[in-house]
Amino acid sequence: MKSELIFLPAPAIGHLVGMVEMAKLFISRHENLSVTVLIAKFYMDTGVDNYNKSLLTNPTPRLTIVNLPETDPQNYMLKPRHAIFPSVIETQKTHVRDIISGMTQSESTRVVGLLADLLFINIMDIANEFNVPTYVYSPAGAGHLGLAFHLQTLNDKKQDVTEFRNSDTELLVPSFANPVPAEVLPSMYVDKEGGYDYLFSLFRRCRESKAIIINTFEELEPYAINSLRMDSMIPPIYPVGPILNLNGDGQNSDEAAVILGWLDDQPPSSVVFLCFGSYGTFQENQVKEIAMGLERSGHRFLWSLRPSIPKGETKLQLKYSNLEEILPVGFLDRTSCVGKVIGWAPQVAVLGHEAVGGFLSHCGWNSTLESVWCGVPVATWPMYGEQQLNAFEMVKELGIAVEIEVDYKNEYFNMNNDFIVRAEEIETKIKKLMMDEKNSEIRKKVKEMKEKSRLAMSENGSSYNSLAKLFEEIM
């Protein structure tokens, strides 16, 4: 009888890709295992649609993709941001129950587990109805996971964690070697309007799961991983990363060819790449400051610049229709020999290109892992979610990044941010980022971590062995 795992990712590209690539890894490592991935559509994220199409166009043996029925975007648009994903899964519970019921009744298949994104952990109730064990996938790092458990524990002890918002307190968090400034705490955990009670309820449910699988590796976050393992109230931890989509999403291949062709013409390690994630957009005044900082730095650049969602629209836009309307007058002409401004970018391919020597990033966890895998140092520009914390970890804990602004917050459901990072700061930090290896300790550390990341995924590496232990638990 074959064994089957059911995966339920959250419908945002950073969550979905990690779980699907993990499913492919599971299948490649265990010949008697099949995986069914249940995908819910999310109205804002065009990347989900593109990636989904690529999966259906290039199927993987023993990997089944099931698209759950689409729901009306109007069901979510007026909800507070913390309530959107819970609403998504609530609308899909009946469909998920029917799928699990049908699979558990099969005489040829044994359902060995449900692996749910942390945001969808409440689906555990349905898995329990069918005696299917639930495992949790954490798309963020071990440091963040430890912080969330710590804040949830404080909340359970009746400490008002919202008091940390806008304070100069430093917290002693078990998953961090250094005190964590309150200013880098994810706002969703300390904002009275941010749904922190609901989020902490998810981490309480996580403690009921069979195990937690994290997209990280021992050598990157040894302190955080060890702290989680030392806590008897946290389920077994399995770091199995870095799990990355190294082949891209299969879309925009013509645009990718143009971008990579331009990089082919640049000297090695000469280009700084700017990309701020699926929801990383700026107001016009900030765009102009970035442009001036880039121009003054004198470095070659590739800049992924994407517009905010237009009023009345529900989907992110891939690029501006007219760049001259938002950039400084004459910028494109003056920098035409050294720079290229684009919309969508094939991020992993760009980071892996020998011409790229630095990455100005929003510090999403997937982007962090990609920069490590490719050995490209980062200048941190965190914007939303847990990215401020990721930036702090990269700069202070790991020493693999240059700090620009770790307190910049531009929450993707509230783009009205008055804080401006000035051109002078951007110029200075880009110059520091692009220093050669002889003069840059950060660049040396990133190159070392690149080798460690690849060893972790190789036979008998730390993540390879961690996955083997997880199979023993599941099978």
From Swiss-Prot:
Molecular functions per Gene Ontology: UDP-glucosyltransferase activity
Residues binding an anthocyanidin, per UniProt: 15, 385
Annotated binding of UDP-alpha-D-glucose, by residue: 345, 347, 362, 365-367, 370, 386-387
CDD domains in alphabetical order: GT1_Gtf-like (cd03784)
Enzyme class: transferase
Record's catalysed reaction(s): (20S)-protopanaxadiol + UDP-alpha-D-glucose = (20S)-ginsenoside C-K + UDP + H(+); (20S)-ginsenoside Rg3 + UDP-alpha-D-glucose = (20S)-ginsenoside Rd + UDP + H(+); (20S)-protopanaxatriol + UDP-alpha-D-glucose = (20S)-ginsenoside F1 + UDP + H(+); (20S)-ginsenoside F1 + UDP-alpha-D-glucose = (20S)-ginsenoside Rg1 + UDP + H(+)
Known EC number: 2.4.1.363, 2.4.1.366
Alphabetical keyword list: Glycosyltransferase, Isoprene biosynthesis, Transferase
Function of the protein: Component of the dammarane-type triterpene saponins (e.g. ginsenosides or panaxosides) biosynthetic pathway. Glycosyltransferase that catalyzes the biosynthesis of ginsenoside F1 from protopanaxatriol (PPT) and the conversion of ginsenoside F1 to ginsenoside Rg1. Triggers C20-OH glycosylation of ginsenoside Rg3 to produce ginsenoside Rd. Mediates the conversion of protopanaxadiol (PPD) to the ginsenoside compound K.
UniProt xrefs under PANTHER family: GLYCOSYLTRANSFERASE
Family: Belongs to the UDP-glycosyltransferase family.
Protein name as it appears in the record: UDP-glycosyltransferase 101
Protein species of origin: Panax ginseng
